[in-house]
């Protein structure tokens, strides 16, 4: 029987894992190894994918992938809780004492003050970025869904100016399945950090230690940060830290990154092992006398180490790490070592003998060896807690939020509530108040400059240029802050991962995976981090498709445009029109995705293998940090890009080609420039040169559209009513919804897609699609009498 046939609420034992290539290795790395007990928790509302529980955590799989896993021993779910044992408390060793773990000193000690570099490495969603913030005092955004960190970030460890730590993307192993795993592995091999800080989720220690074992094989000074120990204790669990140190051969420091507990001790141990070059005390986790093929694995790995030792030394790759990767069939490592034909044949012969003796293939044998060691260690050192409050709370919440009949209505209700509160109640109200305040300040400055008798041209620059341009954009700050507040709550709570789970089957119909939904949701805030978040997708096809679709998710920078026009033309229906624009972007994106799926991006989307974290109450600090960062970014942009754009626009609309002050802006330099683009927009119903000019400046930053119009209208926004009817204003909004992203987003596209040509095509593609859709809206409107 295969895993996809297992009934909800039943347990079974994995017999074998089918499939091939990197995906199968990823399944094994995630703990889906023969002999592992799994529980079928639920199916997604549309019947696919499914949620499994194994090794104390939840994992999602598609039915097609689950069909490749053979199971047996089906029975009802075991609800018996772990028996609580009493473990004697042993004081944790101080820095330099080494306690009962034994390190190997290489002798390459550094003097105090010499530079130290660390890699901060751990599974996804284990608190890694929170720890990075505690170590460095930085304010990186923290979320409760897999893949928040999509790029490496460097920071200086507090009170240690000589020590730099790099926050690397969350990974599950050092196998080259995802881009993050390759980035992390390359960092360790090429950058050669002086030390590793491996953060482990203590509430899910069994799966987390799988990566730890591979990091130890890198033979780099290392400490293990046992995070979330406060939750383990609160739920009646225990981890015997000293015994764990003895088993792993590295310092283990219990911490709570969220509560800033144990951070000082962690820093001291990390600095010590790095400075004195104290490498892990053991690299060999094979059981030389083990049963079920364990001894064969031991002999095979040691034989491979002997075979490749010189090649590994020349390639500057740790021999033990290289050997295990070769046994797994890692082609990248094989290529880097440069073995000759005879050596490759010898290698394959060794592995073939091991496979025959183990009765397992190479990948399953290595994964089984690691997990058997982990199970043995956990049996000796860990008393598992009873079901945590967070997990019990998550199970109850998921009955509604991922329920068969309630998931989609709940998602629609949540998003509708967010948009209504942002655009119709809280955000809009605060924006109106701020606008009144800015008008008061502008009026006061105008009267003060008039009383002072300032030169009229300079007076115009300050009031009609700077105050009008920057002030008009700043007035929309509350809307953006409120939107990011709600998006941050979705991220921190863990709901983002559930959305991906619920939407996977639907997204598959348009050629994408449920994992693509997270970057697209982030795109409602800003396209730049959304495009970067596609790095969490293991498939190049899915990654590129998601990048191309992300600009259709209306970013927050367009909100000032929407707010300005809805206030002027649809004051009673502001929220409704804005929500309609967002859904229009989604619909056009879906249609474009179907086109891509059947043309340039044919094929199947990436498998949906993702951990579902427990729901957590959003951290006030994390939410506040994100809001502050976004508000600061918006204000900075207002006083840099928008400030400069306002001055340039004022200059171009004040002077003619001979630099004479014009009486009518129709004679200005700006009218000349805008006149070239205006004919393109005549079929759309807004061919005035001022409108085309504003759209052109929107390429630098979408907020510039509002500041440009404000400057061109001399602050009198009632001029809009002479250029637009409510219907033509709607057509204009549709165009701005879909046309080219800002220059920062285009730069991100270039970086992620790898070529300037791709970025240029995105600009052209978005502008063409925007024009076609806006024209279609206008034609349909005219046919029905608008």
Go through the PLM ranges and name each one.
Residues 92-173:
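Conserved G1/Walker A P-loop phosphate-binding module
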Residues 160, 185-252, 561:
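Conserved C-terminal guanine-recognition region of P-loop GTPase G domains, centered on the G4
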Residues 232-285:
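Canonical P-loop GTPase G-domain recognition
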Residues 276, 283-455, 659-661, 665-670:
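Extended helical scaffolds that flank P-loop GTPase cores
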Residues 357, 364-365, 384, 425-466, ...:
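Extended, low-charge hydrophobic alpha-helical regions
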Residues 367, 396-444, 449, 456, ...:
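Hydrophobic alpha-helical transmembrane segments
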Residues 440-444, 497-527, 602-626, 670-672:
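Juxtamembrane inter-helical linkers in multi-pass membrane proteins
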Residues 522, 534-542, 550-614, 722-786:
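Juxtamembrane and boundary regions of transmembrane helices in multi-pass small-molecule transporters
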């Amino acid at each position: 029987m295969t895993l996809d046939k297992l009934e909800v609420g039943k347990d079974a034992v994995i017999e074998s894992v089918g499939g091939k290539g990197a995906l199968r290795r990823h399944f094994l790395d995630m703990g889906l190894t023969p002999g592992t007990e799994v529980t079928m928790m639920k199916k997604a509302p549309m019947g696919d994918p499914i949620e499994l529980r194994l090794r104390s955590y939840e994992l999602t799989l598609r039915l097609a992938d689950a069909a490749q896993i053979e199971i047996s021993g089906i029975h009802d779910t075991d609800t018996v809780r772990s028996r609580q044992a009493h473990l004697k408390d042993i004081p944790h060793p101080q820095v330099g004492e080494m306690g009962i773990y034994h390190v190997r000193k290489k002798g390459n000690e550094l003097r105090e003050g010499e530079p130290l570099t660390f890699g901060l490495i751990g599974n996804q969603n284990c608190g890694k970025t929170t720890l990075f913030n505690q170590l460095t005092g930085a304010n990186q955004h923290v979320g409760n869904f897999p893949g928040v960190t999509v790029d490496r970030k460097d920071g200086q460890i507090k009170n240690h100016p000589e020590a730099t730590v790099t926050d690397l993307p969350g990974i599950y192993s050092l196998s080259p399945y995802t881009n993050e795993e390759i980035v992390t592995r390359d960092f360790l091999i090429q950058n050669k950090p002086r030390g590793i800080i491996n953060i482990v989720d203590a509430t899910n220690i069994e799966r987390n230690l799988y990566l730890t074992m591979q990091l130890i094989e890198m033979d780099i000074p290392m400490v293990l940060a046992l995070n979330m120990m406060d939750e383990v204790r609160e739920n009646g669990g225990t981890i015997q830290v000293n015994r764990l140190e003895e088993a792993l051969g590295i310092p283990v420091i219990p911490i709570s990154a969220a509560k800033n507990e144990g951070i000082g001790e962690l820093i001291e141990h990390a600095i010590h092992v790095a400075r004195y070059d104290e490498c892990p005390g053991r690299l060999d986790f094979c059981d030389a006398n083990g049963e079920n093929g364990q001894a064969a694995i031991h002999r095979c790995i040691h034989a491979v180490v002997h075979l490749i030792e010189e090649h590994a030394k020349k390639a500057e790759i740790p021999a033990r790490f290289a050997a295990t990767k070769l046994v797994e069939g890692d082609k990248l490592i094989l290529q880097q070592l440069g073995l000759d034909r005879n050596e490759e044949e010898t290698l394959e012969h060794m592995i073939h003998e091991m496979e025959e003796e183990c009765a397992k293939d190479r990948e399953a044998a290595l994964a089984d060896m690691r997990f058997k060691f982990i199970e043995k260690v956990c049996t000796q050192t860990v008393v598992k807690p009873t079901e945590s409050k967070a997990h019990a709370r998550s199970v109850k919440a998921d009955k509604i939020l991922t329920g068969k009949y309630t998931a989609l209505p709940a998602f629609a209700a949540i998003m509708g509530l967010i948009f209504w509160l942002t655009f119709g109640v809280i955000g809009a109200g605060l924006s109106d108040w701020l606008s009144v305040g800015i008008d008061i300040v502008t009026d006061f400055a105008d009267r003060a400059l008039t009383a002072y008798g300032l030169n009229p041209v300079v007076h115009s620059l300050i009031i009609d240029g700077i105050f009008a341009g920057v002030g008009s954009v700043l007035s929309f700050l509350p809307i953006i802050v409120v939107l990011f507040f709600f998006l941050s709550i979705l991220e921190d709570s863990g709901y983002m991962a559930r959305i991906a789970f619920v939407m996977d089957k639907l997204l598959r119909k348009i050629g994408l995976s449920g994992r693509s939904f997270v970057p697209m949701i982030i795109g409602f805030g800003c396209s730049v981090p959304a495009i970067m978040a596609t790095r969490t997708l293991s498939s190049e096809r899915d990654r590129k498709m998601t990048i191309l679709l992300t600009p259709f998710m209306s970013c927050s920078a367009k909100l000032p445009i929407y707010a300005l026009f809805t206030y002027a033309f649809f004051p009673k229906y502001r929220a409704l029109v804005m929500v309609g624009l967002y859904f229009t972007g989604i619909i056009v994106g879906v249609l474009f995705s179907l086109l891509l799926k059947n043309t340039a991006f044919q094929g199947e989307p990436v498998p949906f293998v993702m951990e579902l974290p427990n729901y957590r109450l959003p951290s006030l600090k994390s939410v506040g940090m994100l809001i502050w960062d976004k508000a600061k970014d918006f204000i900075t942009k207002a006083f840099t890009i928008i400030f400069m754009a306002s001055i340039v626009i004022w200059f171009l609309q004040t002077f003619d080609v001979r630099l004479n002050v014009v009486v009518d802006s129709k004679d200005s330099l700006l009218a000349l420039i805008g006149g070239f683009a205006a004919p393109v927009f005549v079929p759309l119903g807004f061919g005035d040169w001022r409108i085309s000019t504003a759209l052109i400046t929107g390429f630098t930053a979408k907020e510039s559209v509002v500041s440009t119009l404000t400057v061109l209208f001399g602050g009198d926004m009632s001029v809009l009513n002479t250029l637009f009817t409510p219907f033509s204003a709607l057509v204009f909004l549709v165009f701005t919804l879909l046309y080219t992203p800002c220059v920062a987003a285009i730069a991100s596209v270039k970086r992620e897609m790898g070529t300037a040509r791709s970025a240029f095509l995105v600009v052209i593609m978005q502008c063409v699609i925007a024009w076609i859709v806006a024209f279609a809206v206008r034609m349909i409107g005219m046919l029905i009498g608008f």
